[in-house]
Amino acid sequence: MLKLIDITWLYHHLPMRFTLAVERGEQVAILGPSGAGKSTLLNLIAGFLAPASGTLLIAGEDHTLTPPSRRPVSMLFQENNLFSHLNVQQNIGLGLNPGLTLNASQREKRDAIARQMGIESLMTRLPGELSGGQRQRVALARCLVREQPVLLLDEPFSALDPTLRQEMLTLVSDICRERQLTLLMVSHSVEDAARIAPRSIVVADGRIAWQGKTDELLSGQASASALLGIKSHIL
């Protein structure tokens, strides 16, 4: 589904270089120290950064130079980027038509995702009238209503309390499994990664330093566990 082949981006003349393959329907966590290049990797996939070299394939098609708006990708950030002057219904509708002129089919898609997110009763409210968790549900709904096969999450739930964060992670995982979406999620928490991502990637110094089973990383048995401050549980 998703393949990066020597995708390179120059950061202060120092190259970050990524080679990666992710299958359709996989849920993968991206972990690593602060400043390692995790968000850079997602931004390269989404098209917000242009690589200096390399190839990016999605579903077998070359999207190395495709503008972000035309890539088969949706991305959700920690800052949800909801428009404060638009209500929930309109914010979700932006994912279908920036002009907010929706046909009957699009209106049904909008309403269906709102029901799935549990926010159908909030459709006439403005973002400022919502809790943090509700705002992230609206932002996630706007991503999912686009029906793109790849979903990128850049720590969108890190500001939520542990109970809400776990609730959102479970919701995302269930939807991705139901729709066979390919998920890549940046996180600082290996525990969060283990909840939804059987596979993890560790980024360090602008490279993929390790990839494998999240459980192995969490147990301290992986070579990259020390990068995340995880010690082996074996005495």
UniProtKB/Swiss-Prot annotation:
SUPFAM superfamilies: P-loop containing nucleoside triphosphate hydrolases. It is a peripheral membrane protein. InterPro entries: AAA+_ATPase, ABC_SmlMolc_Importer, ABC_transporter-like_ATP-bd, ABC_transporter-like_CS, P-loop_NTPase, Thiamine_ABC_ThiQ. Residues 2-230 form the ABC transporter domain. SMART domains: AAA. ATP binds at residues 32-39. Its EC number is 7.6.2.15. The keyword Hydrolase does not apply. It is found in: Cell inner membrane. Part of the ABC transporter complex ThiBPQ involved in thiamine import. Responsible for energy coupling to the transport system. This is Thiamine import ATP-binding protein ThiQ. It comes from Salmonella choleraesuis (strain SC-B67). The gene is thiQ.
